Amino acid sequence: MKIVILLLVAYLLGSIPSGVWIGKLFFKKDIRQFGSGNTGTTNTFRVLGKPAGITVLLMDILKGTLATSLPYLFGLQGVNPLFFGVAAVLGHTFPIFANFKGGKAVATSAGMLLAYSPTFFIYSALIFVICLYLTSMVSLTSMISAVLITLSTIILPFTVPAILPTFNWLLTVIAIALTTFIFVRHRENIQRIKNGTESRLSFGLRAKKIKKKAVNK
């Protein structure tokens, strides 16, 4: 019974629609009615600005971290904490507090990794930042990073155990499932990337090249 209750708590934590609540409370805006209509970090940055975007990012990461830590906090043994992280991710993407329409699972998944292995989280964050610098697109970065991180759960335990000491089949299975889910949630972004109409950040190598071309014209 304790496991069921904590899984429900993890789902409810994940269901907190950070972007929606921040928008309504401080900006009198429902971000679902602006930009891409998504409740996650990227659309919050786009619609509400950098301070709000950073706040939502940290809140969404914290949801995954806190949920994954629940077994430790309540002395629950014999259960893999990743199950609680997955419950939070499901809450984030299908939030009961926002009509089951939520984000794209990236930030809360990162929070789950932070609780599971801080060193692997830092490694994964570096992958994300490098990919973002090279592409200037959050959507493409999220998908590429998900694939690379999934592969890393298999390779690193046998090559660089300092980052991820042991192979955990459940972590790999969850990573594969989340990667698939992230691709599904980004299907509209994939089409825009193909069409060359996907939004880019004013950050990174690609953004610099575009600015340089614009100046030369």
Swiss-Prot record:
* GO-annotated biological processes: phospholipid biosynthetic process
Does the record's keyword annotation contain Protein transport? Answer: no
Localization annotation: Cell membrane
Q: What is its EC number?
A: 2.3.1.275
Kindly state which keywords UniProt assigns to this record, in alphabetical order: Cell membrane, Lipid biosynthesis, Lipid metabolism, Membrane, Phospholipid biosynthesis, Phospholipid metabolism, Transferase, Transmembrane, Transmembrane helix
Which GO terms of the cellular component aspect does the record hold? Answer: plasma membrane
Tell me the pathway: Lipid metabolism; phospholipid metabolism
What domain of life does the native source organism fall in? Bacteria
Task: Note one Pfam family from the annotation.
Answer: G3P_acyltransf
Q: Which residues form a coiled coil?
A: none
Positions of transmembrane segments: 3-23, 56-76, 78-98, 120-140, 142-162, 163-183
Membrane topology value: Multi-pass membrane protein
UniProt keyword annotation of Iron present: no
Instruction: Name the chemical reaction catalysed here.
Output: an acyl phosphate + sn-glycerol 3-phosphate = a 1-acyl-sn-glycero-3-phosphate + phosphate
Give the Gene Ontology MF terms in alphabetical order: acyl-phosphate glycerol-3-phosphate acyltransferase activity
Among HAMAP family, the record links this protein to: PlsY
Q: What does this protein do?
A: Catalyzes the transfer of an acyl group from acyl-phosphate (acyl-PO(4)) to glycerol-3-phosphate (G3P) to form lysophosphatidic acid (LPA). This enzyme utilizes acyl-phosphate as fatty acyl donor, but not acyl-CoA or acyl-ACP.
The record's family statement is: Belongs to the PlsY family.
Protein name in the entry:
Glycerol-3-phosphate acyltransferase
Q: Which source organism does the UniProt entry give?
A: Enterococcus faecalis (strain ATCC 700802 / V583)
